[in-house]
């Protein structure tokens, strides 16, 4: 980014308890519209988010006819989980990579999260969660349902196509501005940075 405006806004918002909670509520509302979360605490938000995500996993499992038990994996051992957990790990890794690139290109700090804290990619996880249930989870289940013999490679291809179809970078840029910038503007400088990351024409 050619300006520090978003980073300054992010820093101001995350260091104030009231504004941090306000952004966290806005993130929840973007993921699950139609719910009134205006009075929920951070702990209540996390609890409700967890319940909604578990329900989403069960729904996608039914859609693809795949048995779903629970999220069970070892971050340092990709092949330790079953096929579905490996697929979910690969899909979320792809999503995190793209979101991280956008966050950095916009000049934001990957570490200053609102819901997630204490990690050098906390804000990346916050933003990625906006799209995980929509993009990453279905891609993972779809690959497993196809009886793939190369989970990692097939999930990467599925995520490439899903992120392209969803215009993820464009949406991510807009959503970060919406969350951090009270003016809700997308400067030309920011958009140039994003276009340079990924040519949507496939080049």
Can you say where each PLM-predicted feature lies in the sequence?
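Active-site helix-to-loop segments that bind/position phosphate- or nucleotide-bearing substrates
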Residues: 1-203
């Amino acid at each position: 980014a050619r300006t520090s405006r978003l980073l300054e806004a992010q820093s101001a918002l995350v260091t104030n308890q009231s504004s941090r909670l306000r952004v966290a509520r806005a993130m929840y509302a973007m993921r699950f519209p139609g719910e009134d979360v205006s009075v929920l605490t951070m702990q209540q938000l996390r609890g409700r988010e967890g319940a909604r995500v578990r329900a989403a996993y069960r729904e996608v499992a039914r859609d693809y006819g795949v048995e779903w038990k629970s999220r069970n994996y070892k971050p340092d051992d990709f092949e330790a989980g079953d096929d579905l957990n490996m697929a979910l790990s690969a899909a979320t890794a792809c999503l995190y990579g793209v979101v991280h690139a956008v966050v950095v290109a916009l000049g934001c700090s990957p570490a200053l999260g609102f819901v997630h804290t204490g990690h050098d990619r906390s804000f990346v996880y916050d933003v990625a969660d906006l799209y995980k249930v929509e993009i990453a989870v279905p891609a993972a289940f779809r690959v497993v349902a196809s009886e793939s013999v190369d989970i990692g490679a097939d999930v990467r291809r599925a995520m490439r196509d899903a992120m392209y179809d969803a215009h993820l970078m464009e949406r991510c840029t807009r959503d970060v501005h919406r969350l951090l910038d009270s003016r809700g503007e997308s400067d030309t400088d920011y958009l140039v940075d994003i276009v340079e990351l990924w040519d949507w024409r496939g080049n």
